[in-house]
Amino acid sequence: MECFFGHLLSGENGAVPSWMETPTGGVGLTPAFGNGVSTRRIQPHEPILLDYAGACDGYHSDQSRLFSLGSLPEDLVKGHQACIDILEEVLTNLRPGAKASEVFARAAALAGRLGYADRFMNTGPAQVNFVGHGVGVELDEIPYLAAGSDLIIEAGMTLAVEPKIVFPGRGIVGVEDTVLVTTGDPEFLTVTPRELVVL
């Protein structure tokens, strides 16, 4: 397994939107590639989102996990738990025959019921209308679990499901797992615990 791509976003850097259609961004190390980690030092009690992709024999996986140095403020912990709950909602609906846009709509509706409609998958004009994407020979490929997608989910599809919530000026929380769609429950291809890791 090789690391293909990834970024580490800590504190307020995690709330900086991307120039790409993605819920995560970051300042980056240079204006030549304004994405990902910055030179800012990681501080205690702030969210540290590690979003990384692996590659093995030409196939990719995608995963995000949340860390902190010491405890996080309670509202960020609740936001992270909301992302885990949204991931579970997506997995409940990720079945052969489901319409990709309906899977997204149910995830967005749950985010709204939990109080995160304006921060789910980023904020303002940077807010994206998807909660997952296909992954395989490319890191981002069809199907997209996105608003407006008429694509029908089929067994054998591999997707990265990535609910994220942005806290402006403070950071980003969330999870991401790569799963295989089966005729039953989706099979996790990423297996590390999804809970916040306090260092």
Features from the language model and the residues they span:
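Active-site neighborhoods and metal-handling regions in enzymes and metal-associated proteins
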Residues: 1-199
